[in-house]
Amino acid sequence: ERQFRRWLRASVNKRRLGWLDKGQEWTYWRVPPKILVERQVAEGRALVDMSVRVFDGEAFLLNCALNFKTEASTDAYFWPDGTLVAEQKEATLPAHFAVPASFHRAVRVAERLAQGFDYLRVDFLTDGEALFAGEITCFPASGLGPDDWFMQQMYRRWLDALSLSWALSTPQPWPRRLYLAAFRRWLTARRTELASEPTPVPRRANSD
């Protein structure tokens, strides 16, 4: 028991201090560290990890993953209608993979939860039928994701919904409001700039 307590203390301290590292959610640093023990929901069955990217209540992309966060992890992106995104270069799910029966319910639940937010990623686990709630985050990967096709598309949609963010939708004290006034001017200019550029048309992969 004494050895376990030492290991537990070292593990918790490492995780707690790691929140300030690059690639971590630094905004959580004031949250008191706690241990959360979750009951096992799969009972030996394989689970699909689904994460839904939502802008102001409208789902844009979903990622489905098997064996998530293991060496055997495979994943791919899908549109909210369940078709595979053609633009992705590194889809690794098996060719026979089909979206779970709970896929469309996950979309509806995520859209309802994210209504009124500029951006949320809403995560679920599913055994195919049952749907288990997971993490909800405002900035996946601490906002340090790769500058790929997905990020470029999400960037456009995020700018369109950004006025819903807490900083821009809530009166702010000085001097923060000075910065936000300048940011609003930049946001308007950036939206105008993007509106003059051609928007790539997303493609659906062939079902066969």
Predicted features, each with a name:
Residues 69-74, 87-102, 156-162, 169-176:
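Low-complexity, flexible helical/coil segments
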Residues 19-47, 95-111, 171-176, 184-197:
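Amphipathic repeat-derived elements
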Residues 46-47, 51-67, 71, 102-119, ...:
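Catalytic cores of PAPS-dependent sulfotransferases
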Residues 25-36, 76-131:
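A long amphipathic alpha-helix within ATP-dependent nucleotide-binding catalytic cores
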